[in-house]
Curated annotation (Swiss-Prot):
This is Solute carrier family 2, facilitated glucose transporter member 3. One of its GO terms (biological process) is monosaccharide transmembrane transport. InterPro entries: Glc_transpt_3, GLUT, MFS_dom, MFS_sugar_transport-like, MFS_trans_sf, Sugar/inositol_transpt, Sugar_transporter_CS. Keywords: Cell membrane, Cell projection, Glycoprotein, Membrane, Phosphoprotein, Sugar transport, Transmembrane, Transmembrane helix, Transport. The modification Phosphoserine is found at residues 471, 475, 482. The lineage of its organism: Eukaryota, Metazoa, Chordata, Craniata, Vertebrata. The gene is Slc2a3. Residues 277-279 are annotated as: Important for selectivity against fructose. Deoxyglucose transport is inhibited by D-glucose, D-galactose and maltose. Galactose transport is inhibited by D-glucose and maltose. Residues 33-64, 112-118, 175-183, 291-304, 353-363, 421-429 are extracellular. D-glucose binds at residues 159, 280-281, 286, 315, 378, 386.
């Protein structure tokens, strides 16, 4: 197998795919900045309809629904990934669901003109479904078009798209840009533009060669696409691996979500996939970002919105750092470093918030702890859970596994968003100790259960888990970690 290169075709395909990740990040962060203005819109609209001032409880419920319905849509979308990718393919699925994004964007963008609370909530639900689908499509497509030696680095671009989307939403949400009383519908409806751009660019991207060969038996087209994407004529080894996997798939029926839970062969990789997704959300990162303005305000920052944007910049910078580290240090190592660093920062956040009234310097300690916490998140728990799921499963169960992992991520995101305010009100600064405890648990789990997938082919990883299932031992992680990874030489990639 020839040495794979970073070709313009590969970069273009991955970049276009990550527009879906950008959409997820943008729509996650876009609702926070105009909170007060949207509440005023809800109040005005209900007053006109009810001919009386709405109760405060009703306003709070509707606002919470506007925020939380996005995660409900994400759960629905993420669980529907397999329905699309097995029927339409990876690329065509991304193309089709942009229609959903455009519909959701239009509903949100015209909600104010129509004076319709229902349009706003329905738009958030629909855009959530779209983003849930994207969290499955994008990592799967990137993992299947990337060379083994570059799979981790390109997989990190999925997370980079998410954090750039969050940052853009924070900046555009400033009151002198689009976060004003007149322009906030444009802020929400802006999601239409990336959807149109991706729809225009996707026809120029290739379909996943693994899907073409394994699912459609189109070997010649898969070979041509691999040669073009990887910049080498010698892709015999990769094609043979796909053919072997295709033979194995033909001997067993397509894997459904239910069969994924029933089969002993899939138990260990599925457990790892779900726990890693939980480690991302129960690390507390979204709680910090959802309520970062208030946290910075409590810490004594005069303009907390700019401190929040600063945290978003740190978020983006360290995602880029992770991109360069992931193929050197490995997924497992970076994930453990990230979890450990976040646990320490959570303790420092608790201590500094408790002592900030007594010691002025503690406000500075709190801000630094938050920024370092965000940096550690993007080194490991941010990017790695998304793309490692695609690495742990072969072609047959991969769509179902992505659906289960994505749904667990969205569900845990929803739970954190729902219960963090109550927990913070009851526990105060001690709430971050809960996240520290979760982080320590996930660190121990990763140490004992998660294999290092750096430099492994999909076949290597799958065989290790199958061997573990047949032997009845929980040793796949140890077995993979003790193997020598595939190295880049003139004879392989």
């Amino acid at each position: 197998m020839g040495t794979a290169k970073v070709t313009p075709s590969l970069v273009f395909a991955v970049t276009v795919a990550t527009i879906g990740s950008f959409q997820f990040g943008y729509n996650t962060g876009v609702i926070n900045a105009p909170e007060t203005i949207i509440k005023d819109f809800l109040n005005y609209t209900l007053e006109e309809r009810l001919e009386d001032l709405p109760r405060e409880g009703l306003l709070t419920t509707l606002w919470s629904l506007c925020v939380a319905i996005f995660s409900v849509g994400g759960m629905i979308g993420s669980f529907s990934v397999g329905l699309f990718v097995n029927r339409f393919g990876r690329r065509n699925s991304m193309l089709l669901v942009n229609l959903i994004a455009i519909l959701g964007g239009c509903l949100m963008g015209f909600a104010k003109i129509a004076e319709s609370v229902e349009m706003l909530i329905l738009g958030r639900l629909i855009i959530g479904i779209f983003c849930g689908l994207c969290t499955g499509f994008v990592p799967m497509y990137i993992g299947e078009v990337s060379p083994t030696a570059l799979r981790g680095a390109f997989g990190t671009l999925n997370q980079l798209g998410i954090v750039v989307g969050i940052l853009v939403a924070q900046v555009f949400g400033l009151d002198f840009i689009l976060g004003s009383e007149e322009l906030w519908p444009g802020l929400l409806g802006l999601t239409i533009i990336p959807a149109i751009l991706q729809s225009a660019a996707l026809p120029f991207c290739p379909e996943s060669p693994r899907f073409l060969l394994i699912n459609r038996k189109e070997e010649d087209q898969a070979t041509e696409i691999l040669q073009r994407l990887w910049g080498t004529p010698d892709v015999i080894q990769e094609i043979q691996e796909m053919k072997d996997e295709s033979i194995r798939m033909s001997q067993e029926k397509q894997v459904t979500v239910l069969e994924l839970f029933k089969s002993p062969s899939y138990f260990q990789p599925l457990l790892i996939s779900v726990v890693l997704q939980l480690s991302q959300q129960f690390s507390g990162i979204n709680a910090v970002f959802y309520y970062s303005t208030g946290i910075f305000q409590d810490a004594g920052v005069q303009e907390p919105i700019y401190a929040t944007i600063g945290a978003g910049v740190v978020n983006t910078i360290f995602t880029v750092v992770s991109l360069f580290l992931v193929e050197r240090a490995g997924r497992r190592t970076l994930h453990m470093i990230g979890l450990g660093g976040m646990a320490v920062c959570s303790v420092f956040m608790t201590i500094s918030l408790l002592l900030k009234d007594e010691y002025e310097a503690m406000s500075f300690v709190c801000i630094v702890a938050i920024l370092v916490y965000v940096a550690f998140f993007e080194i490991g728990p941010g990017p790695i859970p998304w793309f490692i799921v695609a690495e742990l499963f072969s072609q047959g169960p991969r769509p179902a596994a992505m659906a289960v992992a994505g749904c667990s991520n969205w569900t845990s995101n929803f739970l954190v968003g729902m219960f963090f305010p109550s927990a913070a009100a009851y526990l105060g600064a001690y709430v971050f100790i809960i996240f520290a405890a979760f982080l320590v648990f996930f660190l121990i789990f990763t140490s004992f259960k998660v294999p290092e997938t750096k430099g492994r082919t999909f076949e290597d990883i799958t065989r290790a888990f199958e061997g573990q299932a047949h032997s009845g031992k929980g040793s796949a992680g140890v077995e993979l970690n003790s193997m020598q990874p595939v190295k880049e030489t003139p004879g392989n990639a």
